[in-house]
């Protein structure tokens, strides 16, 4: 999909090992949007702030949906993700930073709910599925997660107790179960004001139960 950020999600593969087809799912929404997992390059409607008014949600980098076939004939679906960053870029002052951080987390969670709707559709059809990419989020990554109950990663993995409805990522599981704060990381950032590095688990490969 074209992206206003000029950053489009790509898939590198060996054509001798995989046959790959771009396979967008969901119906394109109208300009007003849809509540029912529309195509990722259109508009999703979701009530971000519990005021009974749904807002328009869009991806600046729409997820890439592919149908893959191995040489042995195994078929699977892949969704490549680059979710919204929660960083309060451009906000000046502590209050503005907090306000923008919360607003960005709401939007990021809505994007993850949109992806989760798509995941549930694939699982209901019995598809083998991989969801992978940069979620710009992870279990326990910041204090604002407590306001919403779950991280975006947990939403995409699935919160229902039935294992048939859940995706699995062993690194995410380690982060969720860790009691001592020792978790895998996939990204490292330098915080200039504090003169230190910050490490986080932001990138995931989630697979269906099969």
Residue spans of the language-model regions?
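Divalent cation-coordinating acidic motifs and surrounding scaffolds
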Residues: 1-130, 135-210
């Amino acid at each position: 999909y074209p992206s206003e950020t000029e950053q489009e999600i790509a898939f590198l593969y060996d054509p001798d090992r995989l046959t790959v087809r771009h396979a967008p799912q969901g119906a394109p929404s109208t300009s007003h949007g849809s509540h029912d997992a529309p195509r990722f390059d259109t508009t999703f409607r979701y009530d971000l702030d519990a005021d009974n008014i749904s807002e328009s949600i869009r991806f600046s980098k729409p997820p890439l949906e592919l149908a893959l076939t191995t040489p042995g004939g195994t078929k699977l679906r892949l969704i490549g993700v680059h979710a919204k960053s929660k960083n309060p870029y451009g906000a000046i002052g502590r209050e503005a930073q907090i306000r923008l951080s919360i607003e960005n987390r709401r939007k990021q969670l809505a994007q993850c709910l949109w992806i989760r709707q798509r995941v549930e559709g694939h699982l209901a059809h019995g598809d083998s599925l991989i969801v992978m990419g940069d979620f710009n989020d992870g279990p326990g990554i910041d204090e604002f997660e407590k306001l919403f109950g779950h991280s975006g990663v947990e939403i995409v993995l699935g919160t229902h107790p039935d294992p048939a409805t859940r995706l699995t990522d062993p690194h995410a599981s380690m982060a969720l179960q860790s009691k001592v704060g020792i978790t895998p990381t996939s990204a490292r950032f330098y915080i200039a004001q504090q003169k230190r590095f910050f490490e986080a688990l932001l990138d995931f490969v989630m697979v269906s139960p099969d």
